[in-house]
C-alpha cells in the first residue's frame, strides 16, 4: 500500500499483480475502503488482471478535507492517480458511489477508460430528503447513527446470519469513515445529476 499527492490531497492506494492492458481500477462505495474488494482480488489475479484499488477522498487512509466535494472532483482524483502512476488507461469498475465516479470518468476522462463496469449505481438521486436525513444523523451522532441501517441495506438477513465475520469487518469499515468525508461525499451524491451528460 502507498500514498501519492493527487489533486491537492494524499490518496491511499494499492496495486496487486502486473499493470497491463488487463488492469482494472476499482472505486469503492460510500463509507467503505479499498478493502471492500478483498474477496475479488485472488480470483482476478488468477485470470491475469492487474488491480488498482484506492480509498476515495474522505475515506479510509486518504485525506478527508473539508467539503464541498463533487462527483466531478472524485473522478478527477481517479484520473490524477492514473497520471502519477503513469498509467494511460484502465478498465474502471465502481460500486454505488464508485459507479457514479465511473460514469463521470466516462464523461470527463473518456480516454483513460477502456471499459466501464457500473454496479448498483445511478445517474441521478431523486431522494434528496433521504440524503439530507443521513447527513444530519451523522453530523449529530457520528457514523454510529447510520451503521446499523447501512448494514441492513447492504446485506440481506440471510447473509448477515451466514457471514458474521464479514459483517463485522464491514461494520468497522463504516464506523471508521471520517464524518467529514461521509458528509461531503453524501452532499456530492445528493447534488449529482448526469442524466444530461451521459449518452443515451
Give residue spans per PLM region.
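Flexible "cap/lid" loop of the alpha/beta hydrolase fold
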Residues: 100-108, 112-145
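Conserved alpha/beta-hydrolase "nucleophile elbow" surrounding the catalytic nucleophile
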Residues: 28-30, 90, 94-96
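Conserved donor sugar-nucleotide recognition element shared by glycan-biosynthetic enzymes
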Residues: 70-78, 127, 143
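Residue in the alpha/beta-hydrolase core beta-strand immediately N-terminal to the catalytic nucleophile
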Residues: 55, 91, 114-117
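Conserved acidic catalytic loop of the alpha/beta-hydrolase fold
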Residues: 72-90
Amino acid at each position: 500500500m502507498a500514498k501519492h499527492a493527487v489533486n491537492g490531497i494524499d490518496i491511499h492506494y494499492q496495486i496487486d499483480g502486473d499493470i497491463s492492458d488487463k488492469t482494472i481500477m476499482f472505486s469503492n462505495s460510500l463509507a467503505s475502503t479499498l478493502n471492500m474488494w478483498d474477496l475479488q482480488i485472488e480470483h482476478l489475479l488468477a485470470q491475469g488482471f492487474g488491480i488498482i484499488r484506492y480509498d476515495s477522498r474522505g475515506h479510509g487512509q486518504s485525506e478527508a478535507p473539508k467539503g464541498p466535494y463533487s462527483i466531478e472532483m472524485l473522478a478527477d482524483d481517479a484520473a490524477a492517480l492514473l497520471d502519477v502512476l503513469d498509467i494511460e488507461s484502465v478498465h474502471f469498475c465502481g460500486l454505488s458511489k464508485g459507479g457514479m465516479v465511473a460514469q463521470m470518468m466516462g464523461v470527463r476522462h473518456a480516454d483513460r477508460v477502456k471499459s466501464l463496469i457500473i454496479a448498483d449505481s445511478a445517474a441521478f438521486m431523486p431522494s434528496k430528503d433521504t440524503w439530507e436525513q443521513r447527513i444530519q444523523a451523522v453530523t449529530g451522532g457520528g457514523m454510529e447513527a447510520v451503521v446499523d441501517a447501512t448494514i441492513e441495506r447492504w446485506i440481506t438477513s440471510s447473509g448477515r446470519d451466514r457471514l458474521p465475520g464479514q459483517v463485522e469487518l464491514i461494520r468497522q469499515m463504516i464506523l471508521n469513515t471520517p464524518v467529514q468525508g461521509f458528509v461531503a461525499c453524501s452532499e456530492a451524491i445528493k447534488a449529482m445529476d448526469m442524466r444530461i451528460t451521459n449518452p443515451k
